């Protein structure tokens, strides 16, 4: 019986791309891992280094460096290429440079005959995901950004430290921009199935007055707190990429907050933003529409309006 070989390409072997590759190899997510970088020798070096660590894992992944032409048979192409924000910049400030890079990258990949799923981490990820969808001509379910997946993880971590509960027992999502304007759908955050708003109300003596906006800001600024201390972030986003890729290959039907192109969901059209979505082997099977409160709807719409204003600067 012929078995399909799972194949992933990573474009951009900087800290994010190499961290993603390391997660993929350690977890045995695919059988073939192609690395592509504008500095080909760097990609070769990363492939060699990763190949040398495989004997210490329970997996057997073929890792090699190549070019866009090799993307033809890939199931997933992960793009991490792009400039890192400089001190004082937001992710949105890198848009112009990132957009130019995507024109070259997507053109090269599509010329190979690629017909799989794009998975994006390049910032600003929501707008870049939209651009890649437009440039590639692929169906919207097969162009996915990491969106607020990492933000949602950071939110759960912050809440777990506050509540002294395992973060895996906390469910909730950051929505909107992967950036400063993101919001949290507090009406849908639960701890062991119990609404967090109810918990905070019932246990005021224990927790005191909790400023929810402060938690949202702490979540949104978490990346910058890391940046101030070590210069950049890569483990969290690298593992997020690997997690989404694994969910695709395993047809998990797992709900993950990703950058998705909306076409009527949440009353929004022609925009890519962070929302919970069901991830399957075909990419996004369905966008999960949370029943937001009036205040949450307003905050979500405001975040999307900010994204739209920046989209106009690159012609969308």
Curated annotation (Swiss-Prot):
EC number: 1.1.1.27
HAMAP family, alphabetized: Lactate_dehydrog
Name assigned to this protein: L-lactate dehydrogenase 3
Biological-process GO terms, alphabetical: glycolytic process; lactate metabolic process
Chain sites annotated for binding substrate: 91, 123-126, 151-154, 233
Location within or outside the cell: Cytoplasm
UniProt similarity note: Belongs to the LDH/MDH superfamily. LDH family.
Subunit field text: Homotetramer.
Name of the coding gene: ldh3
Binding-site residues for beta-D-fructose 1,6-bisphosphate, renumbered to this chain: 156, 171
Job of this protein: Catalyzes the conversion of lactate to pyruvate.
Superkingdom: Bacteria
Metabolic or biological pathway, per its Swiss-Prot or TrEMBL entry: Fermentation; pyruvate fermentation to lactate; (S)-lactate from pyruvate: step 1/1
Residues at which NAD(+) binds: 16, 37, 42, 68, 104, 121-123, 146
Single Gene Ontology MF annotation: L-lactate dehydrogenase activity
Keywords in alphabetical order: Allosteric enzyme, Cytoplasm, NAD, Oxidoreductase
Keyword Oxidoreductase recorded: yes
Swiss-Prot/TrEMBL catalytic activity: (S)-lactate + NAD(+) = pyruvate + NADH + H(+)
Upper taxonomic lineage: Bacteria, Bacillati, Bacillota, Bacilli, Bacillales
Record entry for activity regulation: Allosterically activated by fructose 1,6-bisphosphate (FBP).
Annotated active site: 178 (proton acceptor)
InterPro entries, A to Z: L-lactate/malate_DH, L-lactate_DH, L-lactate_DH_AS, Lactate/malate_DH_C, Lactate/malate_DH_N, Lactate_DH/Glyco_Ohase_4_C, NAD(P)-bd_dom_sf
GO cellular component annotations of the record: cytoplasm
């Amino acid at each position: 019986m012929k078995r399909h070989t799972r194949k992933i390409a990573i474009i951009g072997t900087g800290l994010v791309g190499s961290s993603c590759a390391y997660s993929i190899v350690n977890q045995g997510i695919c059988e073939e891992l192609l690395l592509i970088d504008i500095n080909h020798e760097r990609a070769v070096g990363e492939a060699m280094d990763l190949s040398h660590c495989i004997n210490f894992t329970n997996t057997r992944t073929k890792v090699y460096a190549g070019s866009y032409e090799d993307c033809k048979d890939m199931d997933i192409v992960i793009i991490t290429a792009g400039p890192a924000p400089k001190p004082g910049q937001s992710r949105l400030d890198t848009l112009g440079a990132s957009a130019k890079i995507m024109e070259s990258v997507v053109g090269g990949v599509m010329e190979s005959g690629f017909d799989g799923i794009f998975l994006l981490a390049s910032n600003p990820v929501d707008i870049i995901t939209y651009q890649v969808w437009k440039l590639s001509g692929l169906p919207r379910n097969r162009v996915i950004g990491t969106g607020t997946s990492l933000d949602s993880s950071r939110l759960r971590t912050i809440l777990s430290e506050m509540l002294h509960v395992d973060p895996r027992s906390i469910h909730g999502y950051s929505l909107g921009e992967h950036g400063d304007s993101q919001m949290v759908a507090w009406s849908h955050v639960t701890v062991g199935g119990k609404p967090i708003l109810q918990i905070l109300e019932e246990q005021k003596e224990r927790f005191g007055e909790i400023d929810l906006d402060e938690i949202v800001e702490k979540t949104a600024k978490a990346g910058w707190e890391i940046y101030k201390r070590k210069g950049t972030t890569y483990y969290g986003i690298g593992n997020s990429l690997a997690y989404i890729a694994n969910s695709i290959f395993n047809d998990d039907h797992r709900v993950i907050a990703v950058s998705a192109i909306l076409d009527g969901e949440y009353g929004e059209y022609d925009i890519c933003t962070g929302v919970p979505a069901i991830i399957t082997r075909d990419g996004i099977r369905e966008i999960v529409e949370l029943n937001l409160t009036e205040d949450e709807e307003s905050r979500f719409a405001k975040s999307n309006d900010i994204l739209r204003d920046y989209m106009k600067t690159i012609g969308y």
